[in-house]
Amino acid sequence: SSVNTTITPSSDLGGNASPTPLYVIDGFIADEGAFNNLDINEVENVTVLKDAAAAVYGARAAYGVVLVKTKQGKVGAPKISYSGQFGYTDALMLPKMLNAYDYGRIYNAARAANTATKDQESDDLRVQLFQSDELEAMKGMNYNLLDKEWSAALTQRHSVNISGGTEKATYFGGVSYYQQEGNIGRLDYNRWNYRAGVNANISKWMKASLQVSGNYGETNKPKNVKGGGSDGDFESLMLHVPYVPDQVNGYYIFHSGMENITNPSDQQKYNFAAVQNASDNVENQNQNFSLNGSLEYDFGWSKYLRGLKVKASYSKNISTGKTNTIGTKIDVYRLISRGGSGGHLYVGDEIEYNANTLGLYELNNGNSLGRSMNRSDSYQMNLTVSYARQFGKHYVSGLFSIEKAESEWEDLNGSLTDPLPFTDGQSSSVDSNAEGFAQTVTFNRSESGMLSYVGRVNYSYDDKYLFEFMLRSDASAKFAPQNYWGMFPSWSAGWVISDEKWFDKDKTKIDFLKIRGSFGILGKDNVNAWLWTQLYTRNPDKGPIFGTNSSTNTSATIRMPKQGVNPDVHWDKTYKTNFGIDMAFLKNRMSANLDFYYDMGREMFASHQGTSYYPNTVGIQPAPENFGEVDTYGVELSLGWKDKIGKDMSYWVKLTTGYNDNKIRETGWKAAYDFDKLVRNERSDRGLWGYECIGMFRSYQEINEYFDKYSITKYLGNTKENVHPGMLIYKDVRGQYDESTGTFGPADGIVDEQDYIKISHRASNPYGGTLNFGFSYKDFSISAQFGASWGAYSLVPTTMRKESYSEYSNVSAMWKDMFVYEDIYDANNIVTVAQNRNAKYPNIRYSSVNGAPSTFWKVSAATVQLRNMTVAYALPKEWLKIIGISSCRFNLTWFVVSFLNPYPEGAWASWAGSYGYYPNLRKFTLGVNVSF
């Protein structure tokens, strides 16, 4: 289970960092994997920081910070709790594809579409089509392998925690187990988590803490070379032609095309079921161990040093991984003699399945044994001196911290080819005498380090006037020694107006009013290391050979990298400005928060483009430089209401919405003109561009009239002779671009990409909102979250609108109503597809024309989703006392229900994921929490 988290909009032009936040677990920096591996029952609370509030964490906090505090022990008798959860995950939706009969009909209509060339009258063509008797038989066939192989995946989670302690020491311990199945094929994932910690008061002025945590995860799945992973398997099953079974009478069948080819490729021989049921396997084991400790001394015993504390902390993390793989050659079969009058069917009463009718083939599923091991070690040390003290109405605090962190990572990979059929996965179980036998070993290693100094001063007067100044200095070894260090200051201030004596809360009905502002500078080092120095690599061949013996046929050469060197590359800078207002009304029942932010990215990593700046004669690619500039800005509004009705009923609602945008000030501008290229001082979202569709050619007369009326000479690279009914009609908008004047000529009779128009001013939704609400009555409660986004249009996915007829691939169900110029006949002169000139969709034969981006495929990008909803009930405590239980709560939760689907015929939806890829999932869980 993983979480994709975005706190602030991305403002990068280059570099290699993804716009993900920094994760901090119990005060120590952690990676996203450690965050995802946390068990929910280990977590006490999660806090999100952004803008200047995140500046204390330096360069890595440019996209915000997720602070996680895990559970700690509390003073009291031992308290034991159990949490159990059972659930299942399923696809938000599966793509709707053509059934067997419609596939055959659409295939025929597309295959015989070029009526101008009289292909329809060709006997050779008619034999290659599905015959009428075959189509009739296909009405009873529908081998939907995606529907067959896809299933809801079960999950379960169990955890047991214990906590307690005295004034001297508190403790917490917990262990949890999580298990998840896959939605497609054979997949099993198991993970154990453990965490134990103790906080001890060594003396009145000294305390220490120690925490040990870790997890062990194991994944088992089939070795699958040709499937291409989860996404590849999903696409393969989705596109499987629905009249071909994957197995008959225990034989794994592969589709050999309309002509029953005898020399198929491994991709054509691929059979998902055969791979899933083979012994080929991938086993992955991952272990993570963390040790955190701290020692704090309080100078509260001194009248003059009271408020001063010194804290030393240390964190050590070790992660190891091991993967074992085995891939063999799997037997699959081609049906030599197929059924139907055209010889295209795989199932029928007249078909036999035996050694004479089945041809045996081998599917190469890797044919190798593999081992890989990796290990990463990291540590973080902090020494922090803090001071906080109240002097009357004056509150002063300060902090100085030194942080040092280092990490190293290495892996080792080995493989052997040609495992023996009876292999148990041992290295000796291979045929080293086989032709092409190979043994390979590779290894990699990397290391990194950071050193930081942090200083912060806070002052407040009467809790009304709040001020903070912070300075952080970071060093990164990614830069040349003279550029290691970056200095990043920040300032913030706040004023609680509602605490002023002159502020009348009764008259204004405002219980709380605060204004705040902040300004800070953050930096990033998101470039590859060693860009500042010249590096060389060794090429084992292509070198000269002088004076060696006749058996020497290779010689090593020294090779320069593909990218240039830039010794001046240094920290980039983001100037972050934030202004906010916090309010509470009507006896604090209503709240409002308004935030404005403006971020100016300067000296950002970017690369110049175009031969005018970097001629081809240089011979290498330009290195990143610090010249990019981008401004990102936005506003966020939050409105909340909470109240009680009577003694036992309460409810709350919170609405959050916002808007964000950006302007590109400087980057590596494209030399050639392009409609959607970045433009100085305009947003990076260039909108959606494509042709203006003005109809569909439904006859040759319409084609002639169009070419004559607009004096068309070229239509997407085609002359009139190659334009046919069933193609979309695009408008000739303008002529060619004149670089000298920066303008376009008038319509020139050539329809090409120069005729693009702006289909949508936005390619992604600029507006969004979230509605959270909840209700409780005694021991019963409901909470939910709705989300929506709007403000843009999108296009039907390229892979969906550019689908073409293929004897090996099915197509979306939307093509069921496809243009057919005239009746299509089989070899017996029987109509297999009736004329359909009033169809909604063009003919997929011409996907290169019809699949181009155009207004024909324009759909709304708006989304509305029920992101999650939980119904909970706590059993009355008087019932539980009898059996010694302090509390018991049941909850039912479901995630992600979508309401809008603008896609044609509902065949797919944007909220379901990318067409042809593993879909987004919804989840339902039933849980119970018991405390003793």
Annotate the PLM regions.
Residues S1-L22, F28, F35, A53-E296, ...:
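Membrane-proximal, glycine/serine-rich, low-complexity loop/turn segments characteristic
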Residues I29-A30, Y252, E259, Y395, ...:
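Short, solvent-exposed loop/turn motifs
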Residues F35-L38, K881:
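Short, T/G/N/S-enriched strand-turn elements that build extracellular solenoid repeat scaffolds
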Residues L125, R191, G197-M206, Q211-Y216, ...:
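Extracellular/periplasmic, surface-exposed regions of secreted and cell-surface proteins
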